[in-house]
């Protein structure tokens, strides 16, 4: 039996955390939003806010112990995961588990789990702890290769390298954009995939698993640009993706929504990455599903029923990005952006801008995917950012 209201403490307060906070408050929860900077998006709608360095173990422990939440919901990768394990040992519920957060915060740990222990199909890969090691490991994978920090946010620090001459620059980019204490990179073969998908996987308290219809998406510089749902998969591809997602989420345990990413290469389904939380490509569910990914996350976390997940025939999202630095942002063009039926625009409330920063998202439904994607693209293009220093 779930007793409400619960007290929810969010570690990370960006646009995804903001939607988690809204979903929690609609269930009567008291929300404490934490992040490393003030006035983060989720803080704007939360009951309370805390600013702290979340990689600081003592600071994180102090905040959580002072608030005594029902659940702690991590929403970012850069956390003092040893503190989460300590809190879990004290009887606090960490979503989905402290181990899941620790394993998935670094690409090497989740890749070793998936490719090694669980024997899931992945791209060929190697690790390098220096530029010299990168030069030694990359050629065996064939050119081009993809170089990534083992820990980063929103695809930052990723490079596609066509030959040995680009490896030093790729190493520097990875180190400059690495989060936490990351000191090495993962280098992967470049997959010529047909489609990249996210399978939102909901693990409930009783261990049962539900799936949302697959979400197709496109990235640039490792960061999501647009997504659409449902993505077209064969029955065989969908069955394989669901089986792999169930295998890895069962291993990680706990309750909540996971964003499990795959590459589709011909008939093959290849595991890519996993986030133990709502996924940026899943923003499309704000318009596509009867229960969006944030509502599904909260229902699973709190042990509430999920009777059915229904999806529109065609829906799409397109991000709205900043193109320069500034500390004051205003928007125009919303009249044009919202003039078509079944469209919506979410502005995230970020006060500062920088090139490539995600400031909002346009959403649309259509009779078919081409129409939905075109509507989302037009809506996003109509929004103009005015950025001042």
From Swiss-Prot:
What reaction gets catalysed by this protein?
A: N(1)-(5-phospho-beta-D-ribosyl)glycinamide + formate + ATP = N(2)-formyl-N(1)-(5-phospho-beta-D-ribosyl)glycinamide + ADP + phosphate + H(+)
Q: Give the disulfide map.
A: none
Name its pathway.
Purine metabolism; IMP biosynthesis via de novo pathway; N(2)-formyl-N(1)-(5-phospho-D-ribosyl)glycinamide from N(1)-(5-phospho-D-ribosyl)glycinamide (formate route): step 1/1
Q: Where does N(1)-(5-phospho-beta-D-ribosyl)glycinamide bind?
A: 15-16, 75, 280, 350, 357-358
Gene3D superfamilies annotated for this entry? Answer: 3.40.50.20, ATP-grasp fold, A domain (3.30.1490.20), ATP-grasp fold, B domain (3.30.470.20)
Query: What GO MF annotations does this protein's record show?
Result: ATP binding; magnesium ion binding; phosphoribosylglycinamide formyltransferase 2 activity; phosphoribosylglycinamide formyltransferase activity
Query: Could you tell me which SUPFAM superfamilies the record lists for this protein?
Result: Glutathione synthetase ATP-binding domain-like (SSF56059), PreATP-grasp domain (SSF52440), Rudiment single hybrid motif (SSF51246)
Asked if Hydrolase is a keyword of the record, the answer is no
Q: Binding of ATP: at which residues?
A: 107, 148, 153-158, 188-191, 196
Residue positions annotated to bind Mg(2+) are 261, 273
Any one of the GO CC terms? cytosol
**Which family does the entry's similarity section mention?**
Belongs to the PurK/PurT family.
Name used for this protein in its record: Formate-dependent phosphoribosylglycinamide formyltransferase
Gene designation per UniProt: purT
